[in-house]
Amino acid sequence: GTLKYVRVEYAGQVITQNNKEQNGFSFYSVGSGTTLENLVSYKGNDDGFEFYGGTASLKNAISYGNSDDAFDWQDGWRGQDNTNWYAYQEGVANYGLEVEAKSVNNAFWPKVTNITLKRAAGTATEAQSEIQLDAIQFKKEGNGEYSNIIIDGYKNQTTPTAKNGGAI
């Protein structure tokens, strides 16, 4: 399938307190034959973009003013041709990137190039947590290959919660 030139506004919400949530864009096990290009998630109530497994890649994406993470993935997502991601966080927001793998068995090293993560002055976190002021969180076995990253306005660049230290 193909998803090109789509803008989703004011979407997403937490639907239960057990981290069941709806994002601006949610991709569940989407394959590499799918085209995801020129997408905008604007001022949603959860993540701008989230991948749950799959092999799809995302090109030319903007996450603007979403109230949780700008970009988030887990459950073995392994997109290999991701480029030109831009995040602007304001008001209430958490990480620019949340990178998670629940175990070593589903940590597949996605690749992302040309990332800009910008946080506006005075942006608060959902849980008022100091750690959520970081640009990138590597959670559990989260990993990947990232290049050409611009980070501005965050307290720290990464949260090293992965076993390997989570460094970029």
How would you name each of these model-derived features?
Residues 1-168:
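Extracellular beta-rich repeat passengers
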